[in-house]
Amino acid sequence: MKRCRGTTFEKAMSKAVKAVSGAKKEAKKTYTLTCGDVSENHHGMQKNGELHSHGYSYETLCKVYHKLTAEGVACEMYALHPHYDGPDPVEEAWLLVIRKGVQHVLQTEDTVALMAENDALDMDKHALMKGRVVNKKARWNLCFDDEDQEPDYESGKGRIVAWKHIPLVSKIREWIAEITEDVPLKVEANYYYDIEKCGIGYHGDGERRKVFAMRMGASMPLYYQWYQRSEPVGPRMKFELHDGDMYMMEAKAVGFDWLKKNVPTVRHATGCDEYTGSVRPKK
């Protein structure tokens, strides 16, 4: 991938790196940026984008795997369905992990510049929950889209940051569209500002069908668990994710159908033990 000095991308890289002068300290925070057909600042709030008719297929994951391994990028394909331990037939579900995918796209040794670009933004620390505006403790959020939007939490609208302010995120988004041979997706940010306190429990992404995500910061595992009739079925699966890693979910692995009771569905979680330690849904 050729680099052209003087471009907006190059200037953003230089500015971001200067903003975090000195050696990078071990991060105690983890950021996840999720590219998908739909984004939202919090469950039940404004949705951005239109739901696609289908998610990524196993064949699409394989194409991405082969393209990147040919470029020397370490990739790992995981089958989730063999870990379902129930009585009924189960759909195949796959997860593709791309090691240091961010570094590969940006041609950097780390994610310092990308984290700095996000740290410069005014993150959503409030959300509308059960009719009330409350402080967000589990994580902070943002959505990225074509136009800026100031938050109106009482109306269920969070902050949206336009692509023009985030050239590094935009570059990765465009790369994802290219390698998947798909349209550019929306982007949703989850900022786990303290990995010892933050997280998200077992859930499926019922708002979207496509997930191609990137991580930056401290290492933090992604967990998966099969469910049926609201009960865990089979062992919990743990996938280690590190600074700059990307992951791509095949359609079933997204968990779009996670609220269905009778069929086997798979949910995912991440963060501290409060959110990931128990696979049983909170009553």
What are these regions (language model features)?
Residues K2-C4:
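Intrinsically disordered, low-complexity regulatory segments of nuclear proteins
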Residues T8-K283:
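Non-heme Fe(II) oxygenase metal-center motifs and adjacent flexible, charged/small-residue loops
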